[in-house]
Amino acid sequence: MAVTIKDVSAKCGLSISTVSKAFNNYADISLETRELVQRTAREIGYYPNAIARTLKTNRSYNLGVLFQEKRGTGLTHSFFASVLDAFKSAGEKRGYDITFINHHIGWTGMTYLEHCRYRNVDGVCVVCADFYAPEVIELVDSNLPVVTIDHSFNNRSCVLSDNIGGLKLLVDAAYQKGHRKIAYVHGEKSSVTENRIIGFYRAMQEHGLNVNPDFVVEALYDNPATSMQAVLNLMNRPDPPTCILLPDDHSTLGAMQAAKQLNLRVPEDLSLAGYDGIRLTQMLQPRLTTIEQDTKRIGAQAAEFLIDRIENPRTAGSETATIPVKLLEGESMGICPVKTDAANS
């Protein structure tokens, strides 16, 4: 015989109404009661009917995720994989599943907003996309609850990693090791890039250092080949930098290859630093100096913002959370090998 909500009610010693409210996350049901009901349901093998719950609450308990990564790494990129895993876990704790939003259902093309409506999602988290694309703006401007990661819209909640602070930590670390000729190889145009460039210039200014415009160059994120070429160009200048900050940890692989081609030792002759704090790069020799982003907190906070907006539309306003980052001091950034002019120190 199939297990029913009545069985859960009897096992918990609660009314059917209370058990139903617990399953549907009503605000007047305590967390302790919800956990008791959910734990009991698992123990006796009861699972609420999703269709019935949708009819009762007018919600699908389904969160859309827009993830359009064009560099080819997709969910193999540890930053995005970790953020999405935390988002998924936080959503599941509050009774929500996730659905990826795209352009197609089979052979049928549609906009992101149309796909959201087709899938009947309660809200959407934009994790990675061209935030300036008309289709993304259409989605953000719709009446659907939306939260964004690492990009801010005036009328939407967002979760930002402290990209300005991250570059400041790297410049501070380089300065403390005697570096004055510091170059920054940044990624392609995005809100993340813009904030990191601001952080670089701001930190250099705080240390009284002039920024050589030729020392701020563009490469592609997660593309070691373009960073390798950027480093070769920088180091072939008459007065090259002594320390180079890269767009991300993967890009430092290209930078290290460039140093090898030029017969430069890292960090004795050239210091390098990455960004993201990918665990695998901590196995490099020398161990990489980098910035670790709190991906778990980013994903969890995005889920909380979105679900609060879904469940409390009249009281949950647009919020912004800036998540702190952490400097991982490795061995790829060393003491500056040459003396610098006092005027530039």
Which role does the model predict for each range below?
Residues 1-61, 340:
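N-terminal helix-turn-helix DNA-binding module of bacterial transcription factors
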Residues 2, 48-49, 109-110, 132-133, ...:
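Structural motif corresponding to alpha-helix initiation and N-cap regions
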Residues 25, 29, 51, 75, ...:
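Conserved acidic
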Residues 33, 76-79, 135, 193-196, ...:
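Residues at alpha-helix caps and immediate loop-helix transition turns in enzyme cores, especially N-
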Residues 43, 86-94, 141-147, 152-345:
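Bacterial carbohydrate/catabolite-sensing allosteric modules
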Residues 43-49, 105-109, 128-129, 256:
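Short gly/ser/thr-rich secondary-structure transition/capping motifs
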Residues 58, 62-172, 176, 234-236, ...:
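Alpha-helical recognition/docking segments in bacterial nutrient-uptake
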